[in-house]
Amino acid sequence: GSSGSGKSTMLKCVNLLVPIDEGSILLDGADITASGVNANQVREEMGIVFQAFNLFPHMTVLDNVTLSPRKVHGVRKAQAEDKARELLAGFGLSDKVDEYPDRLSGGEQQRVAVIRALATEPELMLFDEVTSALDPELVAEVLNVIRALKDEGMTMVIATHEMGFARDVADQVCFLDEGRILEHGPPKQIFSAPSEARTKQFLQRIIDAGRL
């Protein structure tokens, strides 16, 4: 959807940061918006990555990645560091373990942000326009990380303006407009045969801009 259509708000609703007005949100078949649900416990099942990298500038890459597992989940320091090093190596950042964020490129910082979210071993990953703050040449770095997560079977909800990426990676695509899910379905349906006039208009503008 276009800017202001409600993509970020939807992700915040899934993460229980914004209350929903009606309906329900199911995670593993359980309604996480039901009365009495512990929001903090639900959030422990999710990882979320925003547009801004939000790394702690006074901490090394290793400390950024291990902070939540240690402080929130009670993982022993040695175990958390072993897991962090494994993740960093898997995403080509093993040589950045002791670096501080200001020594990293934007693409590297965003990859560390993704790894930090993965370090808590979430059931669900939420991505909110994670490439929008990156130079175009760095976008592929982060998109390749998300592709790798898909190949590993990670469940993800992604808000993105990278239409070609969404078409290639998604199992289901939702088009949002003015705070509503106007249309949803498999990528082939949404991108090749959308039923709503607003969806068609949006996609045509993307095509005209050479972004699809």
Language model feature labels by segment:
Residues 184, 188-212:
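C-terminal boundary and immediately downstream tail of ABC-type ATPase nucleotide-binding domains
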